[in-house]
Amino acid sequence: MARSLAWRCCPWCLSEDEKAAARVDQEITRLLLEHRRQVRGELKLLLLGTGESGKSTFIKQMRIIHGAGYSEEDRKGFRPLVFQNIFLSVQAIIEAMDRLQIPYSRPESKLHASLVMSQDPYKVNTFETRYALAVQSLWRDAGVRACYERRREFHLLDSAVYYLSHLERIAEEGYVPTAQDVLRSRMPTTGINEYCFSVQKTNLRIVDVGGQKSERRKWIHCFEDVTALIFLASLSEYDQCLEENGQENRMQESLALFGTVLALPWFRATSVILFLNKTDILEDKVRTSHLATYFPGFRGPPQDPEAAKRFILELYTRVYAGAAAGPDGASKGPRSRRLFSHYTCATDTQNIRKVFKDVRDSVLARYLDEINLL
C-alpha cells in the first residue's frame, strides 16, 4: 500500500527494486480488476435433481435456444445413442414379460425376442434391417403392449414409446436424428459437466451433476458462488421406484434430496428455481395410475392432472417451508432466499423457451440489475 502510494506521488523516490515491485503490484491489480469485470458478467446456476428428472434434456434445450443448436453433423452423432435407447427399451420389456409372466400373442415373437436379446445395446452403431423388423413386429404384439401398460412395475426409459412409435423412420437408410430425437435420447450423467451460454449480455454457466446417488458425493466443490439453484423434479415418477433401489419411491427420494440441498449452509440465501417436469407424461399416466395409491394425502379427482400437479407442488413447497423453519417451527433466521416454481415439459422447446424467459425476468433480474446488465 505504502509502495503503491509512493509510486503514484513520488516515483523518483523509489529504488529500482521498489519500482519493479510496484510495477508487478500494478499488474496484479489490473488483472484482479479484469477478472472481477469478467465475473460480474457471469451467472452460475447449479442444476440439481435425481436421476432421469430431465436435467440433460434441459441442457440440450438451452443449447438449442441460447447456444449453437445441433447441426446435421451433430445430430448424426446421436444415431448410436438412439439405437441404444431402442434396444435397452425393448430388452427391458422382454425381460419384464418373462418376470410378469405375460405371454406373447404372436408365435414368431419369441424368435424376434431372442434376436433382440442377443444384441449388446452398448455396442450398437447401426440399426440392421433384421433387428428393425424384429423390433417392429414385437411392438405390434398385443402381449408386448400389455406389458408396456404395466411399465411402472419395471424400469423403462420415458422415451421408449416415442422411439417405438417412430421405428419406420428411424430404420430408414441414411437416418439422421431430428432435434426431437436428440432431446429424447437418454445417457446417464456421470461426473460434473459445465455448460456456458450467452443470454443477451449475460454469460450463464450451468453446472450439471449426476443425479444417481453414487454421483452426489462429487457435488461439494460446485457450491461456491452460485447465483441460483435449478432443481428438476419429475411429476410422473410418483408410482416408480429408483433404478438403483427397487424399493424406494422415486418421488420420495426427490423430495428428500430437495430437503437435503435446501439445508446446506451454502444455499441459505440462494434463490431456488423448481422445475416440476414431465407434465406430458403425468397427463397420460394419471388416467390409469392413481396418485392417491402412492400418496394417500392426495384428495383430488383420480384422473385430474391439474389437481395432481397442484398436490405435488404442495409437497415440494412444504419441504421448502420446513427447511426455512427450526424444529419448533420458528424461522431459522432472516433469509433472502425465495422459491420460484414452474411446470415444465423439457422436450417441448417452446415451453422451455418461455419458462426460462420467465426465470430470467424474475429470479435473475435482480442479479443482472446489480451488475448493470439489464
Swiss-Prot record:
Keywords linked to the UniProt accession: GTP-binding, Magnesium, Metal-binding, Nucleotide-binding, Transducer
Residues holding Mg(2+): S56, T189
Domain G-alpha: 41-374
Region (G1 motif): 44-57
Disulfide bonds: none
Assembly mode: G proteins are composed of 3 units; alpha, beta and gamma. The alpha chain contains the guanine nucleotide binding site.
Family from the record: Belongs to the G-alpha family. G(q) subfamily.
PANTHER family: GTP-BINDING PROTEIN ALPHA SUBUNIT (PTHR10218), GUANINE NUCLEOTIDE-BINDING PROTEIN SUBUNIT ALPHA-15 (PTHR10218:SF217)
Protein name as it appears in the record: Guanine nucleotide-binding protein subunit alpha-15
Lineage summary: Eukaryota, Metazoa, Chordata, Craniata, Vertebrata
Gene name tied to this protein: GNA15
